[in-house]
């Protein structure tokens, strides 16, 4: 879903066979988009530091997902606490960082984690509210969400 100058993507476990596959697809997609953005910048003759995206990866088991029609156009959207929390994580991921919540990484199985070079047992988490890059809204609305850089 397109949101202002951002994009929200959903990775339903049912679509990816299981939760681990969905978590892996989410992480792989963020990494691929970040790499692609840098390639586009270089191809366009731009400094890669001038073309940066923020990534906030989160897990939500209970969002409302459905179709909403606005201005005669139907689009799929999701609503709920997890969606708002993901937005707070994303807002804190400055400088092209990929910030992933502990909730997301807990759904990543050992085989999928190894396939994408992640050792979930060695991850160091920081509470969102403790990040220097967390805006006031993130500090206020979701300070205790544990996140790590990927």
Q: What are the residue ranges of the model-derived segments?
A:
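Amphipathic alpha-helical segments that line or abut small-molecule/effector binding pockets
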Residues: 24-35
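Acidic/proline- and glycine-rich, intrinsically disordered low-complexity segments
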Residues: 82-88
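Catalytic core of nucleotidyl cyclases, primarily class III adenylyl/guanylyl cyclases
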Residues: 1-24, 39-81
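Intrinsically disordered, glycine/charged-rich C-terminal tails and inter-domain linkers
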Residues: 63, 73-74, 85, 94-150
């Amino acid at each position: 879903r397109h949101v202002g100058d951002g994009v929200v993507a959903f990775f339903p476990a049912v679509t990816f066979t299981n939760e681990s596959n969905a978590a892996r697809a989410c992480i792989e997609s963020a990494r691929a988009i970040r790499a692609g953005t840098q390639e586009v910048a270089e191809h366009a003759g731009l400094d890669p530091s001038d073309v940066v995206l923020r990534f906030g990866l989160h897990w939500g088991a209970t969002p409302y997902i459905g179709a909403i029609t606005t201005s005669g156009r139907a689009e799929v959207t999701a609503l709920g606490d997890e969606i708002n929390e993901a937005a707070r994580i994303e807002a804190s991921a400055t400088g092209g960082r990929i910030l992933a919540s502990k909730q997301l990484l807990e759904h990543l199985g050992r085989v999928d984690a190894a396939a994408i070079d992640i050792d979930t047992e060695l991850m160091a988490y920081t509470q969102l509210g403790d990040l220097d890059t967390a805006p006031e809204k993130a500090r206020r609305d979701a300070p205790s969400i544990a996140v790590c850089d990927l």
